[in-house]
Amino acid sequence: LYQLIRGLLKHLMPVAGSSKADPARWRQEGRRPRVNLLGPSLLGFRCRDDIREVRLLLEELGIDTHVVAPLGATPADLLRIPEADANVCLYPEVAESSCRWLERQFGMAMVTSVPIGIAATQRFRHELQQVLQLDAIPEVADASRMPWYSRSVDSTYLTGKRVFIFADATHAIA
């Protein structure tokens, strides 16, 4: 992904010393904020499901999904990446180097929280709020009861058992 993005966007890089992109420019332009979802791939574990859920979450917050890459992205899509207000690094093992390069070269803000799990989803929402300078966003309804439910579902079944976790790095760590 990094090589594709860098190769395609090299000729669009801002002149050295120019001002960085403002992640809140969407306000001046009178539109909704938009983000790129970077990292999902065809070989990823449940990537299509993750994209669907993250898009729903973004929609709830009033944020548009601009480009999803590399999954399904064309060279024309990759050329549109700098039009977004920020990049969401959904799979750091695939997209972190691209997001860091876009941050350095285009001044694009990067959201690093991966919304897998209740606490991580809350961090993701708050990071989006800070990066895009959104108005206050409501907390997830009944969030205080969710961790208890999450802990209790498999706790008796898995207690004392050995398990093997098979997934990409993002899902395994989550």
Name each model-derived stretch.
Residues 1-174:
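An N-terminal assembly and electron-transfer interface module characteristic of large anaerobic redox
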